[in-house]
Amino acid sequence: MKKNIKYIVAAVAGLWLTGCTDDLDRFPLSSLSPETYFNTEEELETFTNHFYSQFPSAASGYGESEDIVNIFTLPATTIGLTRTVPTKGGGWNWDYLREINLYLKYSHRCNNKIAREHYDGIARFFRAYFYFEKVKRFGDVPWYNKPLESNDPDLKKPRDSRQLVMDSIMSDIDYAINYCDDNPELYRVTKWTAMALKSRICLFEGTFRKYHGIAGHETFLEECATISKRFIDESPYSIYTSGDKPYRDLFASMNAIQQEVILARDYDYTKGVKHEANYNTMAQTYGRPGMNKKIVNSYLMTNGTRFTDQPGYKTMQYYDEMQNRDPRLTQTVVGPGYMRINSDKVESPNFSSSTTGYQIIKWVTDASCDGYMGSSNDYILFRAAEVYLNYAEAKAELGTLTQEDLEISIKKIRDRVGMPNIDMFAANANPDPYLCAPETGYRNVTDPNKGVILEIRRERTIELCLEGHRYYDIIRWKEGKMFEQPFLGMYFPGLTQGSGDNRYDVFDMNDGIAGDKEKVDICIYTGKKPSVKNIRKFYKLGEEFVLTDGDKGNIICHDIEKEPRQWNEERDYFFPIPTTERSLTNGALTQNPGWNDGLDF
């Protein structure tokens, strides 16, 4: 039975408005009085329950795009040229902070010390989480640790330094680690959730500082390594390995699997709490997500060698390129022989539902959930594998990584699917040219242990694909230029049949696996639709998709010649401050570099 988080909507009525000066001085007096509330453990729990709605919905995972997955309409952050300074909103909202600080001001009224310290830990966890999200998005922000009155001069104060805010975040998350209950719960914050959040925060801050030239990166990376190792040693969590397809099943399970999942967002179809993971992937008129070719290429062979070292890898067709690859590839996208959960029918990629042909199946459950808002599998917010990855990356970026460190982190993750571990010395002796190339990899890694850093990034990209991490991974690594590169799909060698303008070819995506070798999967054609029998699906070139070299090549998604993308290195690593907020502070709140908002103070 799931334990549902019940949000106290009535207790926070009136707080759902954006804008610094509105949000921070509001309290729903019609609902409750702070001077008479917060007396019991139950009241502390009830009030803090609402903080959980800060967490992202499932759509932030299965709907992730960036450079890993290409959707029908790219987000403005990827296109770059269309980004503008908003008048209001844009992530500059402070309602949750007001609630958290209000709670912390009055929670002392509860005489149950153990309960109070636990729920104070919950509140400080969420304040750390709130500010971490703000720092990622805006950089320096004003720090508030109290609920403000409407005439408080701090409402118009400038930003505080990044160091002050990060030190305050560390203080909050350390308190949460020390005082939150350590009993594992899928849908509530515990000591272990706080440790996982600290690991995430410290890795972000340490690598952001390192690659953006800000002092102090070593301190945060060391903190990340320390707390991650403590989690590995002390926590009750481990990597889920049961079944034939444990990686797929981890995300398709209706109830989050507690062996690995530290915290999940609870979905329940019977209670009307649903999402659209299946619909997003299977519908022909919705997101049409497809994995980018460069990410497909980054999956290793089953023996641990690089796919991109294979002769002719660039022109391999779908069936051949999918053979003997890291099993996570065909547990993330449709592969040859793919069958839906609870089905024995072999299916091929549906190009009408995928921009690249590499159709996403991560988070996808059985066909009964394919309708709009038909999915209700839990969404994972924190899991053990992320902490293991954080540990390995922090140690690698510090230059203190050992093979033993990889044994207790990356190896455990790869053991799930039978993949060999990273060999640190081999990786450093021969860094992957594909991951070094600016077109397909990371241009800013220059450390002596460059090879193993790249391999850990490969592992992170594959393991955490479609879990909402990729955009800010690119930000912290200072690799925004990735968004300017072409987004490509499957390769097709050409149309060899027919003549003139009416040419076509047929492609068996499953090589007869379906049991009907007389019926191939698709026919691609130009001009008039050919009279070819036993074809499951026809696609007209130029309408259904476009290839890089006319009648052959890779599928092109969002052609950069027609839809140019530009990443501004001096501007785009931070979001702009809304103009209304700057005006309310008479310019004390400065704009982020490179964003011209037309205000002159």
Per-region residue spans from a language model:
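Extended amphipathic alpha-helical segments enriched in small hydrophobics
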Residues: R127-A128, S199, D378-M424
